[in-house]
Amino acid sequence: MNIFQTSLKCCVGLVLSVGVLLGDSKAFKVRVDKSLTPPFLNVLSLAFKQDMKKEIVFVITKSNKLSKKVLCDFDAFLLPEALMGDMPEKALFHKEFLFQSKENKTLYAFSLIDSQYCSKGGNYRNELEKLERWFVQKAPELAESYRVNYKNQYNKTQTPQK
């Protein structure tokens, strides 16, 4: 093998390694409703980071009338059932009901974006399925413990309140 081929293989290997590393560090974007409080979203975010070693970003949007381009910027949705019902059916994949708010009895549902709807494939589907499994397993228990321990809320910038 000559020097050019060796250099080319090293360069391609480096690009692939960096691409995999950067791809793994991408945070999941989850659209949420303003009714979910920032302290509860912090609880979800910190638990997700601890369990999955990956970041999650919660994005609050004002309008439910979102274009396909805007919807495809999200990896998943955590919304009240009523708002989830207004979303295009083709955009959602595996809608799951997770928990109910104590105050106004709002039922919250979680759904992944359908990767075929957004023309995303490959490893993206596997990553989304990991996100879904975590939410289905952990979010209901975190919501319940958050309700029970509401006087002991944690915020990233505060110490526990009593």
Regions found by a protein language model. Give the residues of each.
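Low-complexity intrinsically disordered segments
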Residues: 3, 58, 154-156
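Composition-driven detection of intrinsically disordered, low-complexity segments
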Residues: 14, 86, 158-161
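N-terminal segment of the mature folded domain
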Residues: 26-118, 122-124
